[in-house]
Amino acid sequence: MVCLICMAALCGTLRAETIKGNGKVITKEYQFADFDEINFVGPAEFTYVQSEAAPSVTVTIDENLLPYLEVKVKGSELHVGPKTEGMLGRSKDLRPTVFKIKGNSKALEEVNLAGSGSFKADQMVRTKELELNLSGSGTMRIAMLQADELEGNVAGSGNLILKGKVREAKYNVAGSGDVKAEDCESEEVEGNVAGSGNLEVYAVRELTGNIVGSGDIFYKGDPKVKSSCIGSGKVRKR
């Protein structure tokens, strides 16, 4: 969650001049050592595949913006975003006409998205632990997930959409964003809402729901329910 806050701060402070894409779109492929954490900023559309193939990242963007874009792996973390300059960490305000990223790695443990972009994984993602952090108005979508532990954090107006099966899930929503995980079956679920956002979950054995504000928690299944609500929000069975 700390990383999410830092990314949001970076995204919104001390920007230099705006640079618009010239419409001449190019694609560049990068070869990296394996990574299991993804961090990206801005309006990019990121498509991810978990694969045993050699890790790679492909970026499609306006040619005049590519020199201002940083694509790197440090440790096990992939970072894609505007380059920062100087001690104050200034960055260009990039306005691409197209900004697409495709990436594959052998494992996935964390995804951080700040801005209006999107992250999607249409194929199976298997992992022991997965943390998803979304700040802004973007969207994260995983179509087939298998995990022991899952944490999903939404700050702002974004949407987190999940399908699959996990053992333990924890969801936190701050603002007007939504978590749509009623097709992600979980043995135990903890859901926390602060604001007007909503959670949709599937809990088998136990559900703990905490609400401050007007948001609601909707659930499928027949779990033992513990709830605390301050405001007009409620924990409701589908």
Language-model region placement:
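Intrinsically disordered, low-complexity terminal regions
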Residues: 1-238
